[in-house]
A protein has these predicted regions:
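Short, Asp-centered acidic motifs that coordinate Mg2+ and/or phosphate
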Residues: 7, 32-34, 166
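Conserved catalytic core of nucleotide-sugar-dependent glycosyltransferases
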Residues: 18-138
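Short beta-strand-to-loop acidic/aromatic patch adjacent to the donor-nucleotide binding site
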Residues: 5-16
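C-terminal catalytic/acceptor-binding lobe
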Residues: 110-190
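Short, conserved alpha-helix that lines the donor NDP-sugar binding/gating region
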Residues: 1-2, 157
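Active-site charged/polar residues at nucleotide-handling catalytic sites that mediate phosphoryl
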Residues: 3-4, 30
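Active-site-proximal beta-strand/loop segments in catalytic clefts of secreted hydrolases
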Residues: 11-13, 38-40, 171
Length: 190
């Protein structure tokens, strides 16, 4: 909030993405001010691979059925119907690809913890010693479920507790670099 930027975009360095898909996210910022691309965890979901084999998925297509995606759905009951060209509401998603409108951060600011820095910047850093930092992203425990919330899920939890919504962009196809390129498709793997 120290600048006049209108959005904050997280794109992790280990995420493979396509520019047109990311730019398209901006078209939905009014209806979906927190909009995420869904990407696979760095693991192979062997149960999903087995299920795909049993359904007769060709060997050259199995890589699209290996993923456990970094997203949690609202009221998931085993079947997902998401329009592929519109944002879809979810419980939470990862910051590996997350677009946040400035007004979201401004609305959250009075409701997040703060701390004061105690380090001196080296090399002309922008954060000064003694500056108050807003802690939008931290780990926490969900008071209802007692689940551990990672930094990205904590952010989503706080925004939802203030009446906001988290959306995903199903048209964004992301890969996650690890020991190899983990791939998956949100509509197929959830």
């Amino acid at each position: 909030l120290k600048t006049d930027c209108t959005h904050l975009l997280f794109l992790d360095s280990d995420i493979r993405w396509k520019t047109p898909e990311i730019l398209r996210m901006l078209a939905f910022v009014e209806e979906a001010p927190v909009l995420c691309g869904v990407y696979p965890k760095k693991e192979i979901n062997w149960a999903a691979v087995h299920a795909a084999v049993m359904r007769g998925v060709p060997a050259d297509q199995l890589k699209h059925h290996t993923a456990t995606m970094v997203v949690n759905l609202i009221g998931y009951q085993g079947a997902v119907a998401v329009p592929g060209d519109r944002p879809a509401e979810v419980l939470n998603a990862g910051t590996g690809c997350m677009l946040i409108a400035r007004h979201v951060l401004a609305a959250m600011a009075p409701h997040v913890d703060t701390y004061v820095t105690d380090t001196m910047p080296i090399g002309g850093g922008t954060i000064q010693n003694g500056e108050v930092i807003l802690e939008f992203f931290k780990t926490s425990i969900d008071p209802e479920t007692r689940h551990l919330l990672s930094e990205d899920y904590h952010f989503c939890h706080v925004w939802r507790s203030l009446g906001g919504k988290i959306h995903v962009a199903p048209w964004v196809a992301l890969g996650h670099f690890g020991s190899y390129l983990f791939e998956g498709e949100f509509l197929k793997d959830t």
